Amino acid sequence: MNDRVEEIRGVRVLVCAEEGEKLAGEGDINDFLGKAWELEATMVAIPVARLADDFFRLRTRLAGAVVQKFVNYRLRLAVLGDISAWIAESDALRDFVREANRGRDIWFAADLAELRSRL
């Protein structure tokens, strides 16, 4: 399956496919942002499989860089998939996810169905 845009309750969401380029470094962020802008999406839903492990290791600061860039460009981000193993290893990540899910710009959801219900 390819990346696609899906309209969910008035929100244009770029739903990234499970397979494809990984977001592995700060330089990769622009690829996802560019595609969102090109397709006029206001939210990007990225599966866990498309994120490098460093995203979940907060000490690498990759997650912070991703979040900052999305916020700066006024795009919302949803991370889709099971991150329970990562949360079990890191209290800081658990707190980060909990705080993100309280907000409006960055969400972590189990799957696209959960994202649909939140929007």
Model-derived features: where do they sit?
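Amphipathic, Lys/Arg-enriched alpha-helical "gate/interface" segment within cytosolic domains
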Residues: N2-L119
